[in-house]
Amino acid sequence: MSWAKQRVPFLDDDDGEEENDVQDDVDSPVPTRPLVIDEDAEPAAGTSGGLEGGGGDDEDGEDGHALPDLDDDLLLQFEPMLPRVYDLLLPSLDARLNFVNAGQKYAAFLKYVHGDCATCSHGEILREKTQLLTAIVSKLMDINGILEGKDEPAPGK
């Protein structure tokens, strides 16, 4: 299977400039250049294989990481999508992904609550699931009411 070169562009700053592939701020604890995944690459010493950008003493990187060769056939390339201020607030990749994911869920919830998702195909599914959950809770409460009613003696007997 042949994969074409793909770049995943994301917004970095509000200035509209495209970010370079080389890290601008050397003092930043998080590298800002893209992660390159190449399944056909030979594993370098000290790496698990397939990932370029890690490794020993390469001449390209100032921080001990090799810069990716952009002339190769790349499968996937990640670029930062958050402003640089989040480098300090969210130091790990997991923290950044969780931040973005929580923001997307919150935005989707607000659209659903305020009715802006009339054209959204997921809106009908959410309404059906809400109705189903309401019906299940109602049945459970009815069962509890029936069981509580059987414990009490009937008023006519």
Curated annotation (Swiss-Prot):
InterPro entries: Herpes_TT2 (IPR005208)
Stretches with biased composition (Acidic residues): 11-27
Subcellular location: Host nucleus
Keyword Cytoplasm: no
Main location: host cell
Annotated Pfam families: Herpes_UL33
Keyword Disulfide bond set for record: no
Region Disordered: start-end pairs: 1-69
Keyword terms, alphabetized: Host nucleus, Viral genome packaging, Viral release from host cell
GO (cellular component) term, any one: host cell nucleus
Gene Ontology biological process terms in this record: viral DNA genome packaging
Quaternary structure, from the entry: Associates with TRM1 and TRM3 to form the tripartite terminase complex.
HAMAP family in the record: HSV_TRM2
Function (record text): Component of the molecular motor that translocates viral genomic DNA in empty capsid during DNA packaging. Forms a tripartite terminase complex together with TRM1 and TRM3 in the host cytoplasm. Once the complex reaches the host nucleus, it interacts with the capsid portal vertex. This portal forms a ring in which genomic DNA is translocated into the capsid.
Family: Belongs to the herpesviridae TRM2 protein family.
UniProt-recorded name of the protein: Tripartite terminase subunit 2
Record organism: Human cytomegalovirus (strain Merlin)
